[in-house]
Amino acid sequence: MAQTFLKLDTGVTGTLPNANFSGGKIGQVVNKVDDTYQATSSNTFADTSLSQAFTPSATSSKVLIMCEHQCMKSSGNTGIALQLLRDSTNLGQFISIGGETEEGTRNDFGSACFFYLDSPNTTSAVTYKTQMKNYVNGTGGARVNGSGNDQSSMVLMEILA
């Protein structure tokens, strides 16, 4: 790709039309933070409270979704699985972690992070959300934001074409 340089003398005023610049620029950025405690022992995916509406500015835009959940288990041999959806479209299961409870009451899995580059192909509002389920048929349950200080987050970043 050829580089274009722009030399400006001091005191120049006006605007530069963005149509002259290449794609790949960052459009809007939306951040959602959630500290709602949720637990499940079900093997079926259910919505977490981490959900955010987003309206792309062009049908050619891509949306980079960056999610992070604080994951725990209540006890026993269990695990957690997380997946990402755009409205009702499943974008994929990204996290499956689990294991035995350590040191009696230690139940942390830690931070589960995942990234996804979506092409929603719309200028209408869409909603990105995560779902969770108990991953292992064990005796315990999976939790997000379980300690009272934990927070999960979702950052949505529009990449302009």
Where are these regions (language model features)?
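Short, solvent-exposed loop/turn segments enriched in Ser/Thr/Gly
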Residues: 46-48
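Terminal beta-strand-rich extracellular "head" domains
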Residues: 32, 38-39, 44, 56-125, ...
